[in-house]
């Protein structure tokens, strides 16, 4: 028994003195950007060679970044293009195919619904230019708001990102960014009790517009039914401040209806502005379904009429959205009603749904239909008509024309003119002949 125990201890001692080689394990990390098999288990003699052949995590990330940089840009993705050579050689679409509306199924499984995709003629580039960044910086520094951002205007890349300082512009929105009304087409914030008016806003607005050095600018405002005067005196003060800082500037104001108070309308019309704009938005039959219940079609007509009566030489302007379900007969009636109150300028644009909480688009109107209504409006005697899918009431499409009309009425740069005493129709004919309208 004792001999057996001694033999066992001898075997244990001999086994413990034997050195067992330790295996070196190479650790492998997995990244979502690459796929590679796990490396084999190697010993210390060849571990250095395997580390040289396997890419490091930093090398993998660098390779992935290189692939992204070599591919299409984000703007190519949004516009439907591509960065490869094959996509650049696509055959142009014919008009019938380009204007064809495409549908898509959206929603969770089992509850998908078909929607009409945004037509190609309504897609605009992503804004990113020096002028865009400069204007945005000025607005933030002066605590100003714009309808371009609040109403999600599709033309912001064009207006803010003009090719030069004089070409870039923004539409200032006065009296804050919160409206007391809730129209079903508008994405501006709404509240029954919006914040109080900023007493520095008139001065800050004048400072911003004087910095930009523009010849023609547009100011608009939210509706403020919580104020006794609807904010009319605030608008008047802003107009006067702007004219003091930049006497030569041409100023357009897109105003509300001031709850039908025509005295306030006359006060704004005689404040020194050059163009008085107030939008009827749609035909009379659709107004109760499109606009806030406090805004009526007939009240808007009275506002436009009162502005013209307060200053007969003042240019009056309004805007109509298409694609809400209006009929051709209703549009004819609307244009006749506007001419009856001597409205000078009318614009037509496509209604585009800002969010799912707003009323749906009834129809995407083709560009040639907008051209047709432009011809009809001019034949009815309107001074100017800007009509197109992306045209908005404060969009700069008509500003060059209106600016020239105003300058000729002032007698500035009129070639063989009559000191600005010509009729509106003669203004139109002379400017068209001079190549202002193309």
Swiss-Prot record:
Cofactors (names): [4Fe-4S] cluster
GO molecular function, one term: 4 iron, 4 sulfur cluster binding
Domain Radical SAM core: 162-383
Enzyme Commission number(s): 2.8.1.8
Keyword Iron-sulfur among UniProt keywords: yes
Record text on cofactor binding: Binds 2 [4Fe-4S] clusters per subunit. One cluster is coordinated with 3 cysteines and an exchangeable S-adenosyl-L-methionine.
Predominant location: mitochondrion
Annotated spans, Disordered: 34-58
UniProt GO cellular component terms: mitochondrion
Positions contributing to [4Fe-4S] cluster 2 binding: 179, 183, 186
Pathway: Protein modification; protein lipoylation via endogenous pathway; protein N(6)-(lipoyl)lysine from octanoyl-[acyl-carrier-protein]: step 2/2
Sorted UniProt keywords: 4Fe-4S, Iron, Iron-sulfur, Metal-binding, Mitochondrion, S-adenosyl-L-methionine, Transferase, Transit peptide
Transit peptide: 1-31
Family to which this protein belongs: Belongs to the radical SAM superfamily. Lipoyl synthase family.
Identification of the protein by name: Lipoyl synthase, mitochondrial
Species whose genome carries this gene: Paracoccidioides brasiliensis (strain Pb18)
């Amino acid at each position: 028994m004792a001999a057996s125990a001694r033999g066992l201890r001898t075997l244990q001692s001999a086994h413990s003195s034997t050195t067992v080689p330790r295996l070196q394990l190479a650790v492998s990390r997995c990244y979502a950007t690459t796929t590679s098999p796990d490396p084999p288990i190697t010993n210390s003699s060849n571990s250095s060679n395997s580390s040289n052949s396997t890419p490091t995590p930093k090398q993998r990330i660098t390779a992935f970044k290189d692939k992204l940089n070599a591919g299409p840009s984000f703007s190519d993705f949004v516009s439907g293009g591509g960065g490869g050579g094959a996509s650049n050689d696509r055959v142009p679409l014919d008009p019938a195919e380009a204007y064809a509306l495409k549908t898509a199924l959206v929603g969770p499984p089992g509850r998908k619904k078909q929607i009409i995709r945004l037509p190609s003629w309504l897609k605009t580039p992503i804004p990113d230019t020096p002028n865009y960044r400069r204007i945005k910086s000025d607005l933030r520094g002066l605590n100003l708001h714009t309808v371009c951002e609040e109403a999600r205007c599709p033309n912001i890349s064009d207006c803010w990102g003009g090719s030069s300082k004089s070409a870039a512009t923004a539409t200032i929105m006065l009296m804050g960014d919160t409206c007391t009304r809730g129209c079903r087409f508008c994405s501006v914030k709404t509240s029954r009790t919006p914040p109080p008016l900023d007493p520095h806003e008139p001065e800050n607005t004048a400072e911003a517009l004087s910095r930009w050095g523009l010849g023609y600018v547009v100011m608009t405002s939210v509706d403020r039914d919580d104020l006794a005067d609807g904010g009319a005196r605030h608008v008047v003060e802003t107009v006067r401040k702007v004219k003091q800082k930049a006497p030569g500037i041409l100023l357009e104001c897109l105003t509300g209806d001031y709850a039908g108070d025509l005295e306030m309308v006359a006060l704004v019309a005689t404040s020194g502005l050059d163009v008085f704009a107030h939008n009827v938005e749609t035909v009379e039959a659709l107004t109760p379904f499109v606009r806030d219940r406090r805004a009526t079609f007939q009240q808007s007509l009275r506002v436009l009429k009162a502005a013209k009566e307060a200053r007969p030489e003042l240019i009056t302007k309004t805007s109509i959205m298409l694609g809400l379900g209006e009929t051709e007969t209703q549009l004819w009636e609307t244009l006749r009603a506007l001419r009856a109150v001597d409205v000078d300028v009318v614009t037509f644009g496509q209604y585009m749904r800002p969010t799912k909480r707003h009323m749906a688009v009834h129809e995407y109107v083709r560009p040639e239909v907008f051209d047709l209504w432009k011809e009809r409006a001019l034949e009815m005697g309107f001074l100017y008509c800007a009509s197109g899918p992306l045209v908005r009431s404060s969009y700069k499409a008509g500003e060059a024309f209106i600016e020239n009309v105003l300058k000729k009425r002032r007698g500035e740069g009129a070639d063989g003119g009559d000191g600005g005493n010509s009729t509106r129709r003669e203004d139109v004919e002379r400017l068209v002949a001079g190549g202002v309208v193309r």
